[in-house]
Each structure stands twice: as structure tokens, then as C-alpha cells.
Amino acid sequence: MSVKDKSKKRLSRENILDSALRIIGTNGIYSLTHRSVAKEAKVAHSTVSYYFRTIDDLTVGAFKKLIADDEAVSDAQLLNLVEKKGTFSIEEFVGVIASGLKSKHKSGYLLQAEYELFVYSSRNKELAEAMRNARKRDVNGVQKLLDRKGYKNVDAEIILSIFGEFARDLVHNNLKGAELKVKKVLNLIEKLKK
């Protein structure tokens, strides 16, 4: 298989996953079928079935893509801060996470898709496992960052839980509540640093 064919295959798979996320975010998880994704992605039904044998495979793939895209955007923003200033503050880090969640909310479907997948994970062991692994990575990464910045008394689990509330407020269009959660995170970090 040539490099061009591999690239084309990857793009087709990415297109299918993007379409699955749009369907989940706009119509709900139970409207996700191979046919609905094929129609949204403008590919043959057999193409969707080729990449994802079952709806569970498609669901887990969509979640993993959502997480990978989030991490890529956050990493790029943090790298940009490091290139400009040599480092970044906790406030800037919190701002990057908050802006990522806000941009998902503005997309019109990504934050809703993440919420739908979270709810559905209670019925799907593989999706629940993927979510647990993503959560562990997040907690470990945030904890290392907090420790490195001198916030050894701050528990990353608490910070991420507040961001879970922030995301929930965004899903329910409670923008004022979401902004208060960001302030709550920053205040909590400062109090616990002492």
C-alpha cells in the first residue's frame, strides 16, 4: 500500500469518526447507525462497516478521536505559551482547558457528543474503560504539572471534577455558572497552595 493510499484511508476513517460525533452530538447516541454515519460522511455503508464492525467499535473510536483532538489542541496551545514565554502559569493552564471546553460548546455538537458518550459508557464496558484510561492520563498529567509548579497540596482529581461541572454547565447553556467554575478552580488552587 502506497503512502498516498494510507493517507486516503486515514482521511476516510477520520471523516467517518467526525460524522459519528456530529450524529451523536446532534441527534443522540441511539441515532448512531452504520447507515446514518455513511450518509453523513458521504461514503458507502460498506466503508463504515469495514472500519468499524459494530456500533460499539464506532462509539469507542469516536470517543478516542474526541479525546485525541482535545489533547492535540491543548498541547498546541500550551506549547505556544512555552515558546512565547518559556513557561506558563497555572492560570494560563486553566484558561487553556476552559477555552477548549468553550470551543467544544460553540461547535454546536462536540460537547453534547462527549456528554452523550459519558452517559452511554455506563452501558458499554469498552467505552467505560477508554474513559477511565483518559481520566487517569488527565489526572496524572495535571498532577505532575501542579507538583512541578509548586502546588503539591492540590489534588488534580478535584480540579478535574470542577471542570466536569464546568462542562455540564456548558452542556445546559448555563454560561454564568461555567464562568464561576473557572474562578472556583483558580481560588481553590491558590488556597491549597499555602
Regions inferred by a protein language model and the residue ranges of each:
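Hydrophobic alpha-helical connector segments
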Residues: D75-S107, I159
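Amphipathic alpha-helical packing segments from all-alpha helical-bundle domains
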Residues: E71-A72, H105-Y115, V119-K149
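Helix-turn-helix
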Residues: N15, S19-G61
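Short, basic, alpha-helical segments at the C-terminal edge of helix-turn-helix-like DNA-binding modules
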Residues: K64-E71
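N-terminal intrinsically disordered/low-complexity leader segments
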Residues: M1-L11
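Short alpha-helical scaffolding segments that buttress acidic/His motifs in well-ordered protein cores
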Residues: I97-L101, E114, F118, I159-F166
